[in-house]
Swiss-Prot record:
GO terms for cellular component: DNA-directed RNA polymerase complex; mitochondrion; organellar chromatophore; plastid. It comes from Paulinella chromatophora. DNA-dependent RNA polymerase catalyzes the transcription of DNA into RNA using the four ribonucleoside triphosphates as substrates. One of its GO terms (biological process) is DNA-templated transcription. Mg(2+) binds at residues 480, 482, 484. Belongs to the RNA polymerase beta' chain family. RpoC1 subfamily. SUPFAM superfamilies: beta and beta-prime subunits of DNA dependent RNA-polymerase. Pfam families: RNA_pol_Rpb1_1, RNA_pol_Rpb1_2, RNA_pol_Rpb1_3. Its EC number is 2.7.7.6. The gene is rpoC1. HAMAP family: RNApol_bact_RpoC1. It catalyses: RNA(n) + a ribonucleoside 5'-triphosphate = RNA(n+1) + diphosphate. This is DNA-directed RNA polymerase subunit beta'.
Length: 643
């Protein structure tokens, strides 16, 4: 099993003081450490902790059975400040151990962290280290996994000491028949064997083999062997050396991979609750623990009455399978199922996966001042803005709104403010608008694979229930608008708001931190829209210069005519333009030059017409272009001038 430890720097005198840890260490736990977790000495000197009975609760009194899986003596009282028999009630009896039932009078929440243990009648192998990938037991013993399994599950004997028998060697596998033959030879009348061979079977034999390993000596030998080997053999040696070095570095012993003691997790983490109809719903772990205790107790009784070896061996195998199912149901052998043929959830199932303890409860905690909604495109937003639904904003910023309502003397207390907020008056919306002004929010899209997966935006109140997102920031989030959801978080402190505004604002994250390439690049319908806006219809006839309705004095007249539906998006027009022009005209000379009597002249190009005075100073320039290109150019120029 694993052992979590750290340096506690908290004040241990006060039971309510939180424990502060410098680090968490996860290593193999020794049998003594597992017993330490569960064993406690009560104030009266009595030692408790071992769970010896498979019972959970008494179905008449509905109270936990003593020495069972929910025992109050081991795990603490079910009700605050009340012992099992009811002799002591109330907080004034804190710390007293009842003389009748032996339960310490304390808070019931201790049942969330007090552990117990089951002392096994025979050692069992830990299924993670036996059947895991890679199998650490097989690597350490330098044996095939199949052979190790044959030993653990009582299919084959292994030679622990060959004795004087020259036909045997250390760790050799023997079937039942082969061992019987060797026994007959060893104990025959004419036998010359003085030192008898010793064989073992089951987890006991495995524990012996692991205990005999001299890790530093084996490590030195492997290092020498690695220098002279290559290919697959070298890779195998390195893998074994790495495991050995880890054991040496952590101070763990290989035999700890075989369990003599099984920890029992606190009862409130595997609860049993009564349903409406009087029936009980219980955690699957209780069934798995019950199987282990039943088989363990049965094995203990069989050993006491000196039952035949074959029966004891079968019971040991069943105990091994029960512990396997408890630790990792389905890893080996037949999966243990409950009602409706549903596989029971083991300790591993509770820890691993998306719904496991780490990802669900420790890494992915629910936080206050956060929300979640579907995202839709907000093309009218600025790049540093996002559309926040009013319904969501009023909930997220409620404390700020209440504070401002009271400060502005609109209401007198929090209760009145909440009533006003529920009605969603215009007054409230006005205050909300003031609150969110300049208060950035964080948007996050899972999975957050790089730092641009969470960015800050200025919220803009919008109707509806969807968050509006600027289309250009989608590549950074790897988001699209086919039903993606995003989470909203509100930075509360001034420091957090400042950090969000300076470091995390979307307009400050234009380049990818990984490659230095721009991460804000238009794509899909943005590119298509720009293409459609600036494309032309070659077949359309181009107007003559000065043609009525198609020659304009400036770009604003063009946009005004388009807005009034007098011209289309792809209509060819002449427009006067005073800015710089970069022409991609292939010919370097104008098509035609018209000279006037006063010495002024006009150059005619394919897409432009320029008039100069006699001193060659530009008088006017008209461009032949489309309405869409004028709109595009004006938008870009306005953005540049605004900045």
């Amino acid at each position: 099993m694993t052992n979590n430890s750290g340096n506690n720097s908290g004040n241990s005198n006060n039971p309510r003081t939180e424990n502060h840890f410098d680090y968490v260490r996860i290593t193999l736990a020794s049998p003594e450490r597992i017993m330490e977790w569960g064993q406690r000495t009560l104030p009266n000197g009595q030692i408790v902790g071992e769970v010896t009975k498979p019972e959970t609760i008494n179905y008449r009194t509905l109270k936990p059975e003593m020495d069972g899986l929910f025992c109050e003596k081991i795990f603490g009282p079910s009700k605050d400040w009340e012992c099992h028999c009811g002799k002591y009630k109330r907080v004034r009896h804190r710390g007293i151990v009842c003389e009748r039932c032996g339960v310490e009078v304390t808070e019931s929440r201790v049942r969330r962290h007090r552990m117990g243990f089951i002392k096994l009648a025979a050692p069992v192998s830990h299924v993670w280290y036996l059947k895991g990938i890679p199998s650490y037991v097989a690597i350490l013993l330098d044996m095939p996994l199949r052979d190790v399994e044959q030993i653990v599950y009582f299919n084959c004997y292994t030679v622990l000491s060959p004795g004087d028998n020259s036909n045997l060697f250390y760790q050799q596998l023997l079937t039942e028949d082969e061992w019987l033959e060797i026994e007959d030879e060893t104990y025959a009348e004419d036998s010359k064997i003085i030192s008898e061979p010793i064989v073992g079977i089951g987890a006991e034999a495995l524990k012996y083999l692991l205990k005999e390993l001299d890790l530093p000596f084996i490590g030195d030998g492997l290092r020498q062997e690695i220098t002279g080997s290559k290919g697959q053999r070298r890779a195998k040696l390195i893998k074994r050396l790495r495991v050995i070095d880890n054991f040496i570095a952590t101070g763990a012993k290989p035999e700890w991979m075989v369990l003599d003691v099984v920890p029992v997790i606190p009862p409130d983490l595997r609860p049993m609750v009564q349903l409406d109809g009087g029936r009980f719903a219980t955690s699957d772990l209780n069934d798995l623990y019950r199987r282990v205790i039943n088989r363990n107790n049965r094995l203990g009784r069989l050993k006491e009455i000196l039952a035949p070896e074959i029966i004891i061996r079968n019971e040991k195998r069943m105990l091994q399978e029960a512990v396997d199912a408890l630790i990792d149901n389905g890893r080996r052998g037949r999966t243990v199922v409950g009602a409706n043929n549903r596989p029971l959830k083991s300790l591993s199932d509770i820890i691993e996966g998306k719904q496991g303890r780490f990802r669900q409860n420790l890494l992915g905690k629910r936080v206050d001042y956060s929300g979640r909604s579907v995202i839709v495109v907000g093309p009218r937003l600025k790049i540093h803005q996002c559309g926040l639904p009013k319904e969501m904003a009023i909930e997220l910023f409620q404390p700020f709104v209440i504070h401002r309502l009271i400060r502005q003397n609109i209401v007198n207390n929090i209760k009145a403010a909440k009533k006003l907020i529920q009605r969603a008056d215009d007054e409230v919306m006005q205050v909300l608008q003031e609150v969110i002004e300049g208060h950035p929010i964080l948007l996050n899209r899972a999975p957050t694979l790089h730092r641009l997966g969470i960015q800050a935006f200025e919220p803009k109140l919008v109707d509806g229930r969807a968050i509006q997102l600027h289309p250009l920031v989608c590549p950074a989030f790897n988001a699209d608008f086919d039903g993606d959801q995003m989470a909203v978080h509100v930075p509360l402190s001034i420091e957090a708001q400042t950090e969000a505004r300076i470091l995390m604002l979307a307009s400050a994250n234009i380049l990818s931190p990984a490659t230095g390439e721009p991460v804000i690049t238009p794509s899909q319908d943005m590119v298509l829209g720009i293409y459609y806006l600036t494309s032309s219809k070659p077949a359309q006839t181009q107007p003559a210069f000065g043609e009525r309705g198609l020659t304009f004095a400036n770009t604003y007249d063009v946009i005004s005519a388009y807005d009034n539906d007098r011209i289309g998006l792809h209509t060819w027009i002449w427009v006067r333009f005073s800015g710089e022009v970069e022409d991609d005209d292939e010919s370097e000379m104008p098509i035609k030059i018209e000279t006037a009597e006063d010495g002024s002249y006009t150059e005619l190009w394919r897409y432009r017409r320029e008039r100069f005075d006699k001193d060659k100073a530009l008088v006017s320039r008209y461009l032949l272009t489309t309405v869409g290109r004028v709109i595009m150019n004006t938008s870009i120029m306005n953005s540049i001038n605004a900045n």
